[in-house]
Amino acid sequence: MSDITKQPANNISSDDKKEVAKASAKSSVEGAKRKTFYKSRSRKLCHFCAKGILKVDYKDVNTLRKNLNSYAKIVSRRQSGNCNLHQRHVSNAIKKARIMALLPFVKD
């Protein structure tokens, strides 16, 4: 019974500890990755709320074109900065203007 050697409490042999130490040293030498911290952006102010516009007119094509992207798709609220109420008015006005042939359905 004197041949039995005591294992460490965490059951990791000294050889395994050396391998783990080598691997951790290798990863730190290869290059430590930096954490990227993103600056939170302030919320955009709704264009229509700022001007005090309650309803969006479908005949005002210049204003509606600002809410379309290059493929003539309606821009989302995040990109345009519109509030929920005005985004719904804008999307309905764009749809009416498309039916009246004031705005294109697809890219030219």
From Swiss-Prot:
What domain of life does the UniProt record list for this protein's source?
Bacteria
* One cellular component (GO) term of this entry: cytosolic small ribosomal subunit
List, as start-end ranges, the regions of compositional bias called Polar residues.
1-12
GO BP, sorted A to Z: translation
The UniProt keywords, alphabetically, are: Ribonucleoprotein, Ribosomal protein, RNA-binding, rRNA-binding
Q: Which SUPFAM superfamilies match?
A: Ribosomal protein S18
Q: One GO molecular-function annotation for this sequence?
A: small ribosomal subunit rRNA binding
Q: Per its UniProt record, what InterPro entries does this chain match?
A: Ribosomal_bS18, Ribosomal_bS18_sf
> Segment Disordered: which positions?
1-33
According to the record's subunit comment, the protein's assembly and interactions are: Part of the 30S ribosomal subunit. Forms a tight heterodimer with protein bS6.
Function, in words? Binds as a heterodimer with protein bS6 to the central domain of the 16S rRNA, where it helps stabilize the platform of the 30S subunit.
State the PANTHER family in the record: 30S RIBOSOMAL PROTEIN S18, SMALL RIBOSOMAL SUBUNIT PROTEIN BS18M
| Family from the record | Belongs to the bacterial ribosomal protein bS18 family.
Q: What is this protein called?
A: Small ribosomal subunit protein bS18
